[in-house]
């Protein structure tokens, strides 16, 4: 492929297509701090705060977006997830970048080079070695805490298993970094009853709580123990991200005790029994979240680990997940209604991966809003494969049509990379351009200060108020 001849691609007005958009972005959105309420960053790396050292570590070690792009470009797996040298892996990524035009990877790559390293050149083979050296010189001295502060990241919420001892979150709290780092309670492993890994996981929880989980009542007691522990350490969010259709069925509490005991005896459970157990657990957890004042998140609509060959070679999160087409909105309705009926429905965010279900999810969340809690039920930001210009615009437009965009809690990275935070800038530029276009078309009043305040709320204030971050320990 020929060389791309464009040095100043990321300009001050990148993605801003009118004077109104420029004013909204530069005067209202640009300088706001970042609230990243869902990501997969390592609390250990932040606590230890050692320099990242190498751009390949930062960009390519766990980034399944880039892995998919490299595979699509014909790169051999050895240069993606294999044992090729860091430099060779970077060179293969540089070969791939020019071929990512119109994929969000192209925009993200150039934004990250610009914001963290002040590099204007398009990454490509002819300048790859120079950029590799320059980025590494910066990363040899930049620690995770410094990278976060550089981007004005005020709050991040990591994703953590209930058995985590949160030692690194405690260390971070004592270190008094610019960025506050809070855990998120993600109990996915509790839902795999009927599988061998469930029994192994129960033993792991027993080690945490120091008592036997020989019945369902003791499991709930153990869950209470871990939720209390997370709450004491600043947690106010949960997350649910199991592959497959969201399901919810009727159950009887006594029956769940019997199902748990049956599994403990090694007797194979029926599919109905598994769903009954999961439904009971969902209700119990959600009521506990409500009791604690937490926000619950549901990431729905993904089919994971489609490629057995790569899954066996690399493991989960190899870049072999995709959009699913599950029917699940009736089950979600029944679940939310069961909690709302007893006034035990916590603040809730749902993220759907299938864009054909955008209006379905947006309208479902609007069914359960409550007086006194603005935006209680959130249809979340464009997620994963939808986290790109078209997907973000569609999410903003559907939410505007079906709900209140003004109460939206804004963007998150859902990332494993400390260099991913320009995605907030990306979202903010798109948001400002969408609102400016409405002004130009006469669809909203030409009141820049009013709309600017709305943009500030979406990008920052709404999240602060929704999660009550100012009230954290």
Question: What positions do the PLM features span?
Answer:
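Residue-level detector of anion-binding/catalytic polar loops
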Residues: 295
């Amino acid at each position: 492929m020929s060389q791309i001849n464009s040095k100043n691609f990321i300009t001050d007005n990148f993605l801003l297509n009118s004077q109104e958009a420029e004013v909204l972005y530069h005067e209202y959105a640009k300088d706001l701090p970042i609230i990243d309420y869902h990501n997969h960053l390592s609390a250990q790396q932040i606590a230890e705060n050692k320099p990242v050292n190498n751009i390949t570590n930062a960009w390519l070690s766990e980034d399944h977006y880039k892995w998919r792009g490299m595979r699509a470009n014909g790169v051999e797996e050895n240069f993606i997830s294999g044992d090729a040298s860091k430099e060779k892996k970077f060179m293969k990524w540089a070969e791939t970048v020019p071929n990512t035009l119109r994929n969000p990877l192209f925009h993200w790559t150039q934004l990250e080079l610009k914001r963290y390293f002040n590099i204007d050149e398009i990454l490509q083979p002819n300048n790859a070695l120079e950029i590799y050296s320059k980025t590494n010189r910066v990363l040899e001295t930049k620690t995770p805490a410094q990278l976060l502060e550089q981007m004005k990241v005020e709050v991040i919420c990591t994703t953590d298993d209930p058995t985590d001892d949160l030692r690194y979150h405690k260390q971070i709290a004592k270190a008094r970094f610019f960025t506050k780092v809070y855990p998120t309670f993600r109990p996915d492993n509790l839902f795999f009853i009927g599988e061998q890994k469930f029994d192994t996981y129960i033993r792991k929880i027993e080690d945490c709580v120091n008592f036997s989980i020989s019945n369902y009542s003791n499991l709930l007691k153990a869950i209470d123990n871990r939720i209390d522990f997370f709450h004491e350490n600043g947690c106010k969010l949960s997350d649910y991200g199991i592959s497959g259709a969201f399901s919810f069925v009727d159950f009887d509490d006594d029956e769940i005790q019997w199902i748990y005991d049956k599994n403990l005896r090694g007797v194979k459970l029926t599919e109905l029994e598994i769903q009954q157990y999961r439904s009971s657990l969902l209700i119990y957890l959600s009521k506990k979240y409500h009791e604690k004042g937490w926000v619950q998140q549901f990431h729905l609509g993904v089919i994971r680990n489609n490629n057995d060959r790569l899954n066996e070679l690399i493991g989960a999160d190899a870049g072999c997940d995709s959009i699913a087409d599950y029917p699940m909105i009736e089950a979600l309705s029944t679940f939310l209604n069961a909690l709302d009926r007893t006034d035990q429905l916590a603040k809730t965010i749902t993220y759907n991966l299938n864009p054909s279900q955008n209006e379905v999810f947006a309208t479902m969340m609007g069914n359960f809003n409550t007086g006194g809690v603005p935006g209680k039920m959130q249809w979340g930001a464009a997620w994963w494969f939808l986290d790109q210009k078209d997907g973000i615009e569609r999410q903003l437009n559907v939410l505007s049509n079906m709900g209140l965009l003004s109460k939206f809690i804004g963007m998150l990275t859902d990332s494993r990379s400390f260099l991913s935070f320009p995605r907030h800038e990306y979202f903010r530029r798109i948001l400002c351009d969408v609102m400016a276009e409405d002004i130009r078309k006469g669809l909203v009043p030409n009141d820049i200060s009013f709309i600017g305040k709305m943009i500030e709320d979406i990008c920052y204030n709404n999240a602060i108020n929704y999660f009550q971050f100012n009230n954290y320990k």
